[in-house]
């Protein structure tokens, strides 16, 4: 991330990470200083902001366009690279980018990769040894509703055709793509309520458990665990004391009753890890299900905890 601390840098170098993705000149200076004190040579990739506009579901998930906090501006990267090459405790081995999240087409990657390879050639022309690693980040889209997920094989072919002639090793970070659809938030209906001509289904999970709908206006499919023959249109809301506490608004859902279980789908990414104790609420348990077997991997939090 853009805010690495001294301690985090020490831990990374002591652990022997493949490389540290440097986001700014100041961070490069810190890394050089820490590596010198440890008697190490820090492996570094420069995270480049390639200034690629991406059509993402929410502007918060655009990370590779000019004016964002992420990465070194494209037109400043060569100068930063030249500084890195002159540092005794820095080994510049690669370049890195991450242009956004929920990307469903190839063009942003093609543009970004083209700019990184241009930089690679300029940096090597400035005296660098052959750069080895090209980290293209993540951001591959998954299907939350009826969207078509990105074609991974076709994506791989696009990347291969661009990168293969350079001889660089490609690193991909497909976090959400791997786990997004693997998680389900299970919640129980507490009450049904009608107010102002609207129907509300009040459940025992709230924005502190899954903040994506409130924070990003993100869509998650919501279904009764036991399907109902009847349907209703309702807001599915939680117990937190603000109007932004919802899991879905104006949804056509199963006509569930108090005590029924409801499944909020595609909650495997940016779900539990973004949960909090807001409103003095305890965090949920996590249960791993595999081939008909299950086990608790994170115990339900208690007030004593």
Please place each PLM-identified region on the residue numbering.
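Acidic/histidine-enriched ion/cofactor-binding microenvironments in catalytic or ligand-binding pockets
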Residues: 118, 125, 130-132, 150-165, ...
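Active-site-proximal beta-alpha core segment in soluble small-molecule metabolic enzymes
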Residues: 1-133, 142, 158
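Charged (often Lys/Glu-rich) extended helix/loop segments that serve as interaction or gating elements
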Residues: 158, 167-305
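Short glycine/threonine-rich loop-to-helix capping motif typified by GTGT followed
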Residues: 105-112, 143-155, 181-191, 249-252
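Conserved beta-strand positions
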Residues: 22, 97, 136, 172-174, ...
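Catalytic core of soluble alpha/beta enzymes
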Residues: 52-56, 153, 179-180
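Glycine-rich beta-alpha junction loops
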Residues: 48-52, 99-103, 138-142, 176-178, ...
């Amino acid at each position: 991330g853009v805010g690495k601390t001294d301690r985090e840098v020490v831990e990374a170098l002591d652990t022997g990470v493949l490389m540290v993705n440097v986001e700014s000149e100041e961070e490069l200076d810190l890394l050089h200083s820490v590596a010198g004190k440890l008697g190490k040579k820090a492996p570094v990739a420069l995270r480049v902001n390639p200034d690629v506009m991406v059509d993402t579901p929410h502007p918060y998930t655009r990370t590779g366009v000019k004016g964002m906090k992420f990465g070194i501006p494209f037109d400043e990267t060569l100068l930063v690279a030249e500084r890195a090459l002159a540092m005794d405790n820095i080994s510049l081995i690669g370049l890195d980018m991450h242009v956004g999240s929920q990307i469903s087409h190839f063009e942003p990657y093609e543009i970004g990769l083209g700019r990184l390879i241009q930089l690679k050639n300029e940096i090597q022309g400035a005296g660098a040894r052959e750069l080895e690693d090209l980290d293209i980040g993540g951001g591959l889209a998954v299907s939350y509703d009826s969207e078509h997920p990105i074609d991974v094989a076709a994506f791989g072919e696009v990347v291969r055709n661009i990168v293969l002639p350079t001889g660089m090793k490609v690193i991909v970070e497909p976090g959400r793509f791997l786990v997004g659809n693997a998680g389900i938030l299970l919640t129980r209906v507490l009450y049904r309520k009608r107010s102002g001509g609207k129907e509300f289904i009040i459940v025992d999970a709230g924005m502190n458990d899954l903040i994506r709908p409130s924070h990003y206006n993100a869509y998650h499919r919501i279904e009764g665990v036991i399907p109902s023959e009847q349907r209703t249109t309702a807001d599915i809301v939680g117990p937190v004391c603000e109007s932004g506490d919802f899991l879905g608004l104006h949804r056509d859902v199963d006509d569930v009753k108090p005590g029924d279980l409801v499944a909020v789908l595609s909650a495997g990414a940016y779900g539990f890890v973004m949960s909090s104790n807001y409103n003095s609420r305890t965090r949920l348990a996590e249960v791993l299900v595999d081939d008909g077997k299950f086990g608790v991997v994170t115990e339900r939090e208690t007030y004593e905890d």
